[in-house]
Amino acid sequence: MKMIIAIIRDADSDLVTQALTAGNFRVTRIASTGGFLRRGVTTLLLGVEEGQVDAVIQILKDKCPAGPDGGKRATVFVVPVSNFLQV
C-alpha cells in the first residue's frame, strides 16, 4: 500500500477531487498554505494499492494544468505504508 500526498493549487482542487472520486479513489482534502508567496494550496491524501499509483498520478497530470509561466502542476509524494488500520 502507498500513501500519496499531492499538493495542488486551490483553483485545481475541485476538478481534481471530482476526477479522483469518479475513479473510485477516496480522497482527504486539507486546505493549506505554502510556497514563496504563501498562496493557498490544497493538500490531498490518498491511500492506494501499489498498482493504482500510476492512475492517480495520471489524473493529477490531466487535471492540474501547468502554470502561466510553465511552472509545476503539483508536488506529489508517494510514501510506502507498512501498516493500515481503521478503528
Please place each PLM-identified region on the residue numbering.
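Positively charged, small/polar-rich N-terminal and surface patches that mediate targeting and assembly
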Residues: M1-V87
